[in-house]
Regions:
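A glycine-/small-polar-enriched, mobile loop at the entrance of the PLP active site in fold-type I
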Residues: 38-41, 56-74
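Glycine-rich phosphate-binding segment of PLP-dependent enzymes
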Residues: 46-65, 84
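PLP-dependent class I/II
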Residues: 3-5, 9, 13-15, 20-23, ...
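Conserved N-terminal alpha-helix of the aminotransferase class I/II PLP-enzyme fold
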Residues: 65-98
């Protein structure tokens, strides 16, 4: 019945992370002992002080529509957060609160892109960037990076990718899926390229900023001359273990913020009222409240990287943030493992599911055909068992 559906939906790829997670759940329901490392979701509970704020909001009868762009006091709190944590000076009129950072990104693409506008995507990138750009009429321009360069785009690569049709560059730091974190020096070098192209805007996805093991974090918008051409995207899902609250937000030039409010008013209107009230408490909190969770992720990172380095043929960078590893498995291409012909990263991912009962995600979904991604947002015991299975399968 695809001929009845729109070309738009027929040309839209299914989210590979969600698809693999669904397949893992299906196999588990069949009684298989599946370890799913496919989804990026903290395995911690929302902090009690945030849950208390949500309960209070219910008792205070926050049960009606909010303003389309979010409650004024929440936008003021987000401005304080941007100033405190990122050195970014925004006014409440430059803030738009949405139903998750994914909607924030979709709003941006819809209001910024005309048909044929090019968007530079340093690869690997988060799975939805590519499809969101396509859905909005834009043309994704992938710039490949590799494990040898810590999966970071260089100024030379950025300059070479720019054409008269370039409208934007989208990137995340810390990066999903590679965990790479750009330093101030690296971002300054990219900014020097962009300052020669005043009509190119940057989307800086900083959803993982607090899950950062490097000791420092820099927002590209804090570099002189960049705030006016940067749209900073963030949210509370990852750092505060609030994935189900569905709150994301942007700080942007005011004309872009107004445009995002305009389109959101025709799609979802304001985000969940109770979740917004809880978010005020989250963004006003000192980041030190997250130390225990961040330290746990740091320890898991070290465990997983150490175990992966024991597997012959696997190459890996050391992720400095987020909660993913993105190993290069290209040395297995062209081999046959336990009767499975391995041609690409997707074959590796499916082989590990079939033979190791471990769900990962192919790097193709993130714009890198040589890698697979898995999340270490689970316990050390589960990670140790998963890596034991992976090692056994890949050394067969």
């Amino acid at each position: 019945m695809n001929h009845i559906l729109s070309d738009r939906i027929n040309n839209l790829a299914t989210s590979q992370t969600l698809a693999m997670a669904a397949l893992a759940r299906e196999l588990k329901a069949q009684g298989k002992d599946i370890i799913s490392l496919s989804l990026g979701e903290p395995d911690f509970n929302t902090p009690d002080f945030i849950k208390a704020a949500a309960k209070k909001a219910i008792d205070d009868n926050y049960s009606t529509y909010s303003p389309v762009d979010g409650y004024q006091d929440l936008k003021e709190a987000i401005c304080r957060k941007f100033k405190r944590d990122n050195g970014l000076d925004y006014k409440p009129s430059q803030i738009v609160v949405s139903t998750g950072a994914k909607q924030s990104l979709y709003n941006i693409a819809q209001v910024m892109l005309n048909d044929g506008d090019e968007v530079i995507l340093p690869a690997p990138y988060w799975v939805s960037y590519f499809e969101i750009v396509k859905l909005s009429g834009g043309v994704p321009v992938e710039v490949p990076t590799s494990v040898e360069t810590d999966f970071k785009i260089t100024p030379e690569q950025l300059e070479a990718a720019i054409t008269p049709k370039t409208k934007m560059m989208w990137f995340s730091s810390p990066c999903n899926p590679s965990g790479s974190v750009y330093s101030r020096e690296e971002l300054t070098a990219l900014a020097k390229v962009l300052e020669k192209h005043p009509n190119i805007y940057v989307v800086a996805d900083e959803i993982y900023e607090h899950i950062n093991f490097s000791g420092t974090f820099c927002s590209i918008g804090s570099i002189p001359g960049m705030l006016e051409k940067t749209i900073t995207v963030n949210g509370v899902a990852k750092a505060f273990a609030m994935t189900g609250y569905r709150i994301g937000y942007i700080g942007a030039p005011e004309f872009i913020a107004k445009a995002c409010t305009k389109i959101q008013g025709q799609v979802t209107s304001g985000a969940n009222s109770v979740a917004q009230r809880a978010t005020i408490t989250a963004v006003d909190a000192d980041p030190s409240v997250l130390n225990e969770m961040v330290q746990a992720f740091h320890g898991r990172r070290d465990l997983v990287v150490g175990l992966l380095k024991e597997i012959p043929g696997v190459k890996i960078n050391v992720p400095e943030g987020a909660f993913y590893v993105f190993p290069d498995v290209s040395s297995f291409f062209g081999k046959t493992l336990k009767g499975h012909e391995i041609k690409d990263a997707n074959d590796v991912s499916m082989y590990l599911l079939a033979e190791a009962n471990v769900a990962t995600v192919t790097g193709d979904a993130f714009g890198n055909p040589n890698c697979i991604r898995f999340s270490y947002a689970t316990s050390n015991d589960i990670l140790t068992e998963a890596l034991r299975r992976i090692k056994e399968a890949l050394t067969a």
